[in-house]
A protein has these predicted regions:
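Low-complexity, charge- and small-residue-enriched intrinsically disordered regions
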Residues: 123, 249-259
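N-terminal, motif-rich segments that launch catalysis or mediate targeting to/interaction with membranes
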Residues: 1-47, 51-54, 58-248
Length: 259
């Protein structure tokens, strides 16, 4: 987990309380939920889920900026998903999702997704990289390069590959104008994992939220009981004094304030 150009990572934004004034970090949204501010908690949870989704986009995990300008360009993967996937076309994903991912804390979700995406998929500008040693191309045919999915050990299409007839150099690229099979190959693996992670994060949110809420309510109850006891003790003390004694007590406090 490293940020673009060594800036803050998505995990930092999602887990580090106090990074920004409008705090929707994990500790803060658990606190919101515990204190009954559910609207803020659920808005914050949406932010966390969005950040976790980013960990299943190769550019986000391979230090590959893609802001759509002439220098960085777009993310081919995000562009293809945005143009080709919607509620109707996602039906097949539903049946291939599997059970939620279960980790002990929110950081583990970010680490797992980022490591898997980084190690198994290329981004457009990191195919020939001196920084990343993975993914590893294990085979070629006339049109494609193949990698091995670390989760299930399956061989899958990972890049387009074409040998230049003049130079003999193997040209590798991630997408073409007319053939998007690599994007589809990536999506079929990354999207179910994103959904499984989100389901696990939601489950973790309610588990931690319940623990935090029970603790908060117990603390509030103890505070109320302590305050009630203090008020009752004061009332009992005052009821035992006559009016003249109360006057003298008040006069004493007033005198002390001015001496």
């Amino acid at each position: 987990n490293i940020g673009i150009n060594n800036n803050r990572t998505a995990k930092d934004w999602g887990t580090d309380a106090g990074v920004v004034a409008n705090d929707f970090s994990w500790p803060k949204i658990i606190e919101y939920y515990a204190q009954g501010e559910e609207e803020k908690a659920f808005v914050g949870l949406g932010h966390i889920l969005h950040l976790s989704e980013d960990m299943t986009v190769p550019e986000h995990t391979r230090n590959d900026p893609h802001i759509g300008d002439p220098i960085t360009g777009n993310s081919p993967y995000e562009k293809w998903v945005g143009e080709n996937k919607n509620r109707n076309t996602l039906k097949d994903v539903y049946y291939s999702v599997g059970s939620p991912l279960n980790f002990n804390n929110i950081s583990e979700y970010f680490d797992f997704l980022a490591k898997y995406t980084n190690s198994n998929f290329f981004s457009k500008d990191s195919i020939e990289s001196s920084v990343y040693t993975k993914p590893v191309i294990v085979d070629y045919d006339d049109y494609y390069a193949y990698g091995i999915d670390a989760l299930n050990n399956e061989k899958f299409k990972i890049l387009f590959a074409k040998r230049d007839k003049k130079t003999g150099v193997m040209e590798k690229f991630i997408d073409t104008k007319d053939d998007h099979i690599i994007m589809s190959s990536y999506f079929s693996r990354l999207s179910p994992l994103a959904i499984r992670a989100e389901a696990g994060i939601i489950d973790l949110f309610f588990k931690e939220g319940k623990i935090a809420r029970d603790k908060y309510l117990a603390e509030q109850k103890a505070l109320q009981e302590k305050t009630a006891q203090k008020n009752q003790s004061l009332a009992d003390s005052l009821s035992k004094k006559g009016r003249f004694s109360l006057f003298l007590s008040g006069l004493g406090f007033l005198t002390n304030d001015y001496i």
